Swiss-Prot record:
Protein name: Protein ApaG
Pfam families named in the record: DUF525 (PF04379)
InterPro entries reported in the protein's UniProt record: ApaG-like, ApaG_domain, ApaG_sf, Uncharacterised_ApaG
Coiled-coil intervals: none
UniProt source species: Anaeromyxobacter dehalogenans (strain 2CP-1 / ATCC BAA-258)
Positions of the ApaG domain: 3-125
Classification via Gene3D superfamilies: ApaG domain (2.60.40.1470)
């Protein structure tokens, strides 16, 4: 699990290995993200940037609008939660990134997604 707070936006991520959807050389992980506005100003998530690293050092960058087809607008005290998936070629790696947020006054900033592990249980022993 990882948590980061940037300008009142808290991003918490939990990842889970999905053995039923994995096979050798293709390891599927789900991750659940909770984005909470702990600040005093409404803000909208407009885009995302993920950096995915596997155990061999291979790096993939994913950039796009919104998350799961949405651009959630969060009033102070509100949160948004979603689950998505990532496939690695190795049994462990990590993800990190940023969400581009825009406050109602037009000010934009990048909310940090702290690094979190993607690990097949027992693969690091």
């Amino acid at each position: 699990m990882s948590t980061a707070v940037t300008e009142g936006i808290e991003v918490t991520v939990r990842s889970t290995f999905r053995p039923e959807r994995s096979e050798p050389g293709r390891f599927l992980f789900s991750y659940t993200v909770r984005i909470a506005n702990q600040g005093e100003v409404p803000a909208q998530l407009v885009s995302r940037r993920w950096i995915i690293l596997d155990a061999s050092g291979e790096r993939e960058e994913v950039v796009g609008d919104g998350v799961v087809g949405q651009q959630p607008h969060l009033e102070p005290g509100e949160h948004f939660e979603y689950t998505s998936f990532c496939v690695l070629k190795t049994p462990h790696g990590s993800m990190r990134g940023t969400y581009r947020m825009v406050r109602d006054d037009g000010q934009a900033f990048d909310a940090t997604i702290a690094p979190f592990p993607l690990v097949v249980p027992g693969s690091l022993n």
